Amino acid sequence: MLPARLPFRLLSLFLRGSAPTAARHGLREPLLERRCAAASSFQHSSSLGRELPYDPVDTEGFGEGGDMQERFLFPEYILDPEPQPTREKQLQELQQQQEEEERQRQQRREERRQQNLRARSREHPVVGHPDPALPPSGVNCSGCGAELHCQDAGVPGYLPREKFLRTAEADGGLARTVCQRCWLLSHHRRALRLQVSREQYLELVSAALRRPGPSLVLYMVDLLDLPDALLPDLPALVGPKQLIVLGNKVDLLPQDAPGYRQRLRERLWEDCARAGLLLAPGHQGPQRPVKDEPQDGENPNPPNWSRTVVRDVRLISAKTGYGVEELISALQRSWRYRGDVYLVGATNAGKSTLFNTLLESDYCTAKGSEAIDRATISPWPGTTLNLLKFPICNPTPYRMFKRHQRLKKDSTQAEEDLSEQEQNQLNVLKKHGYVVGRVGRTFLYSEEQKDNIPFEFDADSLAFDMENDPVMGTHKSTKQVELTAQDVKDAHWFYDTPGITKENCILNLLTEKEVNIVLPTQSIVPRTFVLKPGMVLFLGAIGRIDFLQGNQSAWFTVVASNILPVHITSLDRADALYQKHAGHTLLQIPMGGKERMAGFPPLVAEDIMLKEGLGASEAVADIKFSSAGWVSVTPNFKDRLHLRGYTPEGTVLTVRPPLLPYIVNIKGQRIKKSVAYKTKKPPSLMYNVRKKKGKINV
């Protein structure tokens, strides 16, 4: 075994070198110092070296190096470079990464699905159970007027047992509570079918109208449904009452020519006369036609006081407010405060919308406007199931004077002078209707003012108290207001009656989703097509017109909901197209595929012969598909057309004189290589607002 000093001696000999080498490179001491310094620095930088204990060695020949240490050094260990991953390994890692990302996506997708399921369960909370043992509450639903109960889910006014008991035990009880059906209609546009027959509707309305005392009837008519909107049994239902006919939804009809609203009003007068209503003397409509010979026992000349008399006919839009302020002024001037007022009409005529509009107007007392909830509004027929009411404001001279001042001030305001909120509201209404009006309030009930009054005034005494005038404003009090016995003492009421269901109506065959598509909610944009004999027009899968014979082409203008599809095909392909696409996307209504069409009534044909054409700019007839809309037909001059119309079995196909005879002119250029024309929407008009140039719309 070698001695421990041997490595050091070998190192010393190596460093000492030979004399010639030392002579060539200079003195040995500097070289030794440099190498020792390098060794020392290398020792400190290395983590693998270790310092040896000092041992004196022979330093002869090193000069003054007796205190020098010798160190044993290891070079720093450097790891070998890792080999580069192979292509197979890279592909494997990439595949694992993709699988992990896909797993995370699947997890997020499943979480979103669970959230949607929970959200849908909240959107359709038809939960709870009925309890036939609990008696009815005696409190009416504030949305539809039905008595609240928890006995049967198919009876109007139903609340689940849990909700019924929880609400009854809370503060305030069931007051101002809506039933389950109204809640679903208001929040989710979802309707529950109820077991209410047409006879029950008629019995309820007839009992209300035959209450003792003077009363006025406002009969609301859907202009889109003329002449079917006028009920044939209306005189027997109303009895010897004074009647004002309101043509609603005028905002949905475009202006086909100047003076179209006056023509619509005259048309409504004519339809009232055809329906057997007695027109009041001095009216501006046509004279009542002569009836057939009276039957045995019938008075050939019944007195006017025993008949239903039409006092006036007006066009309004309960949604956009057009004509509502004029209606209020007419009621306050003519009827004043002589008795109750009843709003009557068929289902989906817009009665509840007008009820809510009048509730926020001068026709309702200021306190009643804040104390009574709004009626439920929905396109689903039969929303109102019982009587809703609000107290009518007594039109005293002072109130009439203040109202006239407000209306005069409003008419001088330009649209740019209105508040931003009111401008936004009017802009929204312009998108929904062709004519828009403003409905405001002159007086606002103030709860703070009431607290300062030592005792309660009734409506009349408060109107004549000049020191305690009702506060002007447009915002409702945030506090809950309740009508007291003094408020309703000797009051006259405005009643919203349930809608009378129409027989042979196509809406009775449709689901709630289909009703929302068929019934128009925005201004109707007419769609015009030029057809040749042998062509067929489909209005969804609920209406069809075959062009069988004619000397020339004719124009067919569809006046229906803008989202109800229209499809044109040839006569030899029409049956196959209906069999293939009825219930699917192309025709859209009805929807639900073969299962839906299996229970849907088949289309029934009816031949139609039209009179000679009046030219390319004037229609000769409207072919109306129940409440789904109509097609206005415009043949060429002196051309006679033979058509065939189809509607579902159990519904009515009506051929009437054109309601808008010049509507064919509301079209753009013809689309190249197509039978369709580009649509054109007329502008909307604002009323009771001054234009920019200082001109007032009246």
Swiss-Prot record:
Q: Name one GO cellular component term.
A: mitochondrial inner membrane
Which PROSITE patterns does the entry link to?
G_CP (PS51721)
Membrane topology qualifier: Peripheral membrane protein
Predominant place of localization: mitochondrion
UniProt keywords (A-Z) are:
Apoptosis, GTP-binding, Membrane, Mitochondrion, Mitochondrion inner membrane, Nucleotide-binding, Phosphoprotein
- One term of GO molecular function: GTP binding
Which residues does the record list as Phosphotyrosine (modified residue)? Y77
Q: From start to end residue, where is composition biased (Basic and acidic residues)?
A: 102-126
One short Pfam name that applies is YqeH-like_C
Q: What is annotated about its quaternary structure and interactions? A: Homodimer or multimer. Interacts with mitochondrial complex I, DAP3, MRPL12 and MRPS27.
The text of the family note is:
Belongs to the TRAFAC class YlqF/YawG GTPase family. NOA1 subfamily.
- Which PANTHER family does the entry mention? NITRIC OXIDE-ASSOCIATED PROTEIN 1 (PTHR46406:SF1)
The protein here is known as Nitric oxide-associated protein 1
Encoding gene per record: NOA1
